[in-house]
C-alpha cells in the first residue's frame, strides 16, 4: 500500500493510480493541505475521483501566487506514461485561505479522513 500526497493538488493521482495498478499495489489517494496557519494536514479519500473533486474545490482557496521555477522547480502534471501533460503555474506549497478547523470539516464533509502531518514541529 502507498499513499501519494502532493501539496494542495491531486492532479497527479490518475498517473500514480495507473502505476500502482500495474504493480499490483494498493493506492490510498490523498493530498497534503497547507492551512492558513501553515500547518500541514494529510487528507485521504476512498477513490482517486473523490480526492480529485476535493482538490478542485480546494484550489479556489489557494493564493494566486505564481510558482518560481528557479527556486521551487517545475510543478508538472504527468500521465501514466510519465509524460508531462501540464504545468501548474500557481505555487502549490502556499497556504490556503482556510484555517485548520475549516479544512478538517471540509475533508470530513467530502467523505475523507484528515490526519495532521509533521506533528513534531
What kind of feature is each model-predicted range?
Residues 4-14, 34-36, 121:
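Active-site environment of divalent metal-dependent phosphoester hydrolases
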Residues 19-121:
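Extended substrate/RNA-proximal surfaces in nucleic-acid metabolism proteins
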Amino acid at each position: 500500500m502507498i499513499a501519494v500526497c502532493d501539496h494542495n493538488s491531486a492532479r497527479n493521482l490518475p498517473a500514480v493510480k495507473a502505476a500502482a495498478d500495474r504493480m499490483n499495489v494498493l493506492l490510498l489517494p490523498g493530498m497534503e493541505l497547507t492551512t492558513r496557519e501553515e500547518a500541514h494536514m494529510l487528507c485521504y479519500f476512498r477513490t482517486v475521483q473523490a480526492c480529485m473533486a476535493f482538490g478542485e474545490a480546494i484550489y479556489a482557496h489557494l493564493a494566486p501566487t505564481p510558482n518560481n521555477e528557479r527556486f521551487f522547480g517545475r510543478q508538472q502534471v504527468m500521465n501514466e506514461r510519465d509524460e508531462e501533460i501540464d504545468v501548474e503555474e500557481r505555487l502549490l506549497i502556499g497556504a490556503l485561505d482556510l484555517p485548520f478547523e475549516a479544512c478538517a470539516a471540509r475533508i470530513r464533509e467530502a467523505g475523507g479522513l484528515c490526519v495532521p502531518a509533521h506533528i513534531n514541529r
